[in-house]
Amino acid sequence: MTATAPNTAQQLKYIKDSIKTIPDYPKAGILFRDVTSLLEDPLAYAASIELLTERYLDKGVTKVVGTEARGFLFGAPVALSLGVGFVPVRKPGKLPRATISESYELEYGTDKLEIHTDSIKPGDKVLVIDDLLATGGTIEATVKLIRKLGGEVTDAAFVINLPDLGGEARLNDQGITCYSLVDFSGH
């Protein structure tokens, strides 16, 4: 990107081009979209934070929730840019205060996420952010945690969406509007 302010289409192309695709990782037949290559490029990283922030500037967001671990890398800077608090959702045993948990399905088995019970107040308008939307299971569990605490969540934002895996439709069924900066076809 140049020193002059790029337009949104240029920023989105730059972001997409900064994400490396690794074939056959973590197993044969998978095309892994590596967001860490975006993080290595300060212009791409800054553009992603800027575009995610712009989308929610006037939406009345009071908290941003990020899912472990790469959701922290995008959620925290967006929260800071919006002037609101950031709340981490983590794997079990990683948060020091009282928590509630929610189980969710994985390809083989189940996993669990936790959130501090005092981190979301009734009526908080919460934006959920993660790096990538695939099947939507992690975000669906995160939304359930927020709603258990009385938070209002209607939006989730991602850097990458893998639309072929159905996560957006799954979240739409839960009343969640999804926004992603870039889409990649295939698994």
Curated annotation (Swiss-Prot):
Pfam family, one: Pribosyltran
GO BP annotations listed: adenine salvage; AMP salvage; purine ribonucleoside salvage
SUPFAM superfamilies: PRTase-like (SSF53271)
CC terms in the record's Gene Ontology section: cytosol
Pathway: Purine metabolism; AMP biosynthesis via salvage pathway; AMP from adenine: step 1/1
Location in or out of the cell: Cytoplasm
PROSITE patterns linked: PUR_PYR_PR_TRANSFER (PS00103)
Swiss-Prot/TrEMBL keywords: Cytoplasm, Glycosyltransferase, Purine salvage, Transferase
Gene3D superfamilies reported in the protein's UniProt record: 3.40.50.2020
InterPro entries xref list: Ade_phspho_trans, Adenine_PRTase, PRibTrfase_dom, PRTase-like
Enzyme class (EC, first level): transferase
Gene Ontology MF annotations: adenine phosphoribosyltransferase activity
Catalyzed reactions per annotation: AMP + diphosphate = 5-phospho-alpha-D-ribose 1-diphosphate + adenine
EC numbers for this chain: 2.4.2.7
Main location group: cytoplasm
Record note on quaternary structure: Homodimer.
Function as written in the Swiss-Prot or TrEMBL entry: Catalyzes a salvage reaction resulting in the formation of AMP, that is energically less costly than de novo synthesis.
Family listed: Belongs to the purine/pyrimidine phosphoribosyltransferase family.
PANTHER family assigned: ADENINE PHOSPHORIBOSYLTRANSFERASE, PHOSPHORIBOSYLTRANSFERASE DOMAIN-CONTAINING PROTEIN
Protein's UniProt name: Adenine phosphoribosyltransferase
